[in-house]
Amino acid sequence: MFKLTPREIVEELDKYIIGQQEAKKAVAIALRNRYRRKLLPDELREEIYPKNIIMIGSTGVGKTEIARRLARLVKAPFIKVEASKFTEVGYVGRDVDSMVRDLVETSIRLVKQEKMAAVEQKGRQMAEERIVDILLPFDGRKSKSPKNPFEFLLGSIQERDDVDDESERRRREIGQRREILRQKINRLELEDETIEIEVEEKNPSFMEIFSGSGVEEMGINLQDMLGNLMPRNKKKRKVSIAEARRILTYEESQRLLDMDEIHREGIKRAEEDGIIFLDEIDKIASKESNYGPDVSRGGVQRDILPIVEGSTVITKYGPARTDHVLFIAAGAFHVSKPSDLIPELQGRFPIRVELESLKKEDLKRILTEPNNSLIKQYIALLSTEKLTMDFTPEAIDYIAERAYEVNSRTEDIGARRLHTVMEKLLEDLLFNSPDMAGEKLVIDIDYVAERLDRIVEDEDLSRYIL
């Protein structure tokens, strides 16, 4: 069971996300409350519901990243959906129940990956045994057919003993050769050898054939219903032993899985640990309108309400309850405000967190401090071309200053501005790096100024290029 304290959760999030301590604290508390709830008696546990969160902040300040990193941290089923893509029942578009079905799919996939990892070693052994069978079949049953149909009952004991001795000798000999072959395969000495294997040919997915027809919205698994009616063809493929091991290990591991148990566990995990991130919630928060593009937004809110407050959604794996799913909504709320949501929906998101716009110092820290910082990413990318690159502290400071300046003068897109600035800054290097193998480059403030100043100072250029 997940036992990190709220402080430890925030420290983990700090490795990837700069600032936004209030938002980190809110999600850390929500996560710790799930752990606390699991320790309670059954009667009380059912009565405690998660406190859903609304994150308010402009694009690029870390709303989505906080939720995504949180889910990875606890290995919880997590999906991100855009609220603006849903439509009221009766309009063309996705209905809100599909987010729960997507969560269950994600949860089952997570459980299946864990179960596959648990049986992978056994599956690998079985796969290697199949490869040995292909290379050297174990057939020690060859014997002379009796001429008399009753000879197998009346034949001489001596003749039968001779046949048995010969069969036993051949069986031992083949067994020894198979063991030598098995050891060589296990030591990866025959990886490049080619063998012919039989693999199941996949039939076209029924869900793809009927995509767009709304069949998946009914919670019906046509693939399971009709897939067994289609013949499972096998085709022969010539592959290396390394590739054969991979294919056959997957096949054998699949056979070891109890899919019914995986489906049950996946649904339970989605119900107890699932996180649904509702992005662009502000886009459905506008005032009610009887015509135009806003006509179904109030209806979408009313459709989302029962999902958030707890209901049962029918999926192709079985019913899934949403009572204890954690919902994290997010939006910029530039045009609308949280109070524009219908009151019932506002009440289902009791925790509101405002994320701060990123300052120059925040952008500078984003460039260098996180484990996956942009500077580290570009240095690693160019190192694959045998090109060594480094940035001076002054250059990093100047990049952050220029990115902040563009954000202030044009649309504020937060940390995403750094991506466009860095791409423009390193465009020539990324293009010419294959011809610069072995060189060492230091990106200083002059290099940055030469490539960015003209674009940043020209407001029209910065709007279109950065």
UniProtKB/Swiss-Prot annotation:
Coiled coil: which residue ranges? Answer: none
Question: Sorted alphabetically, which InterPro entries does this protein's record hold?
Answer: AAA+_ATPase, ATP-dep_Clp_protease_ClpX, ATPase_AAA_core, Clp_ATPase_C, HslU, P-loop_NTPase
Named from the GO MF annotations, one term is: ATP binding
Provide the protein's localization: Cytoplasm
Pfam families cross-referenced by the UniProt entry: AAA (PF00004), AAA_2 (PF07724), ClpB_D2-small (PF10431)
Report whether Coiled coil shows up as a keyword of the record: no
Which residues of this UniProt protein bind ATP? Answer: I18, G60, V61, G62, K63, T64, E65, D279, E344, R416
Domain of life (superkingdom):
Bacteria
Q: Name one GO cellular component term.
A: HslUV protease complex
Share an example GO biological-process annotation for this protein. Answer: protein unfolding
Keywords attached to this Swiss-Prot or TrEMBL record, sorted alphabetically, are: ATP-binding, Chaperone, Cytoplasm, Nucleotide-binding, Stress response
| Alphabetical list of HAMAP family matching this protein | HslU
Entry similarity comment? Belongs to the ClpX chaperone family. HslU subfamily.
Biological role stated in the UniProt entry: ATPase subunit of a proteasome-like degradation complex; this subunit has chaperone activity. The binding of ATP and its subsequent hydrolysis by HslU are essential for unfolding of protein substrates subsequently hydrolyzed by HslV. HslU recognizes the N-terminal part of its protein substrates and unfolds these before they are guided to HslV for hydrolysis.
- How is this protein organized at the quaternary level? A double ring-shaped homohexamer of HslV is capped on each side by a ring-shaped HslU homohexamer. The assembly of the HslU/HslV complex is dependent on binding of ATP.
In Swiss-Prot or TrEMBL terms, this protein is called ATP-dependent protease ATPase subunit HslU
Which organism was this protein described from? Syntrophomonas wolfei subsp. wolfei (strain DSM 2245B / Goettingen)
